[in-house]
Structure formats: C-alpha cells, structure tokens
C-alpha cells in the first residue's frame, strides 16, 4: 500500500498546467488551459483527473469538470471552451472541449485548479476566493504561461512561477 501511495503521488506531480489564455477577452476567441505531462509514462486522465474554476472572488468553486483521454509522456493536452473557435483562432484541434462557462473558459481573473484522481488540488493557478482583477494572476486579454524554471505541480499559487501577459 505504501508503494502504491508513493507511486501515485509521483504520477500526480508529473501533470501540471502550463498555459491559460483569454485572447481578446472573449470566449469567441478560443480560451484554453494547457496541461503537460513531464513524466516517462502516459497518464489516463479519465481515471478521475479534473479541472475546477473559482470565479469573481467566490470562495466556493464551480463543479469540477472531468478530464477524458490520455496525455502522452512528454506531451501536452489542450482543454478548450469551444473546439470550433479554438480551431479558427489557432488552426489547431483541442483535445477536450469543456464548453462555455466551464473551467477552460476563464476571462483572465479566475482561479483554476488541476485536481488529481483523489479530488485533491495537484496544481493551482491563482488564489481561491480572490478576484484576480488587478492581482499578480490576472491575464485578462492575454495569457498566463508557466515559467521555464517552474517544472513541477504545486497546490499553492506562487506568482514567481508564471509569466503573465494582460491588457493592464
């Protein structure tokens, strides 16, 4: 059992968020959350992984949105808010479409968490309960990109681990 716990914890740390976008502050422009698997093994996200969003400074999050599919070892996985608009904006296909109003549809001042198979926060962007407007995690009309030297998941937000581009 201890071995299983250690292995599970190691696998959880291999997947983390690398980018969140709010292009043109519009859900029509293909908002998305990008995940990365830094591990040596593929990860089946349908085993309980999810994304969750806190909006407008609310202390209570929206419902967790289940992830599906598999993220390859060393690979990326894109969760978008609208597959057609994502394709029109970037010329690419997202891996999973959550739809408008869900965890991949942030207007740049929301807080987003990657939840592991046990429902705990594996990686956190922002501070739950805090409206991100005017803070170090606001990416309205822009994007938040994980810094190159920030290569592990963290359940606690640290602004120094991210490069933020916004209209303010």
Predicted regions located by residue number:
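Activation on beta-sandwich/Ig-like modules and their edge loops
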Residues: 12-143, 147-149
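Extracellular low-complexity, O-glycosylation-prone Ser/Thr/Pro/Gly-rich "stalks"
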Residues: 136-137, 145-168
């Amino acid at each position: 059992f201890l071995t299983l716990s250690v292995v599970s914890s190691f696998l959880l740390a291999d997947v983390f968020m690398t980018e969140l976008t709010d292009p043109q502050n519009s859900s029509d422009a293909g908002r998305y959350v990008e995940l990365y698997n830094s591990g040596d093994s593929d990860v089946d996200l349908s085993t309980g992984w999810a994304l969750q969003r806190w909006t407008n400074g609310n202390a209570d999050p929206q419902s967790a949105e289940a992830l599906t599919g598999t993220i390859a070892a060393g690979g990326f996985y894109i969760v978008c808010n609208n597959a057609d608009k994502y394709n029109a904006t970037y010329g690419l296909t997202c891996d999973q479409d959550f739809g408008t109003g869900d965890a991949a549809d942030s207007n740049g001042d929301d807080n987003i968490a990657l939840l592991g198979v046990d429902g705990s926060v594996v990686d956190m962007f922002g501070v739950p309960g805090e409206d991100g407007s005017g803070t170090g995690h606001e990416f309205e009309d822009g994007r938040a990109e994980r810094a190159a030297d920030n290569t592990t998941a963290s359940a606690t937000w640290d602004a120094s681990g991210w490069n933020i581009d916004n209209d303010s």
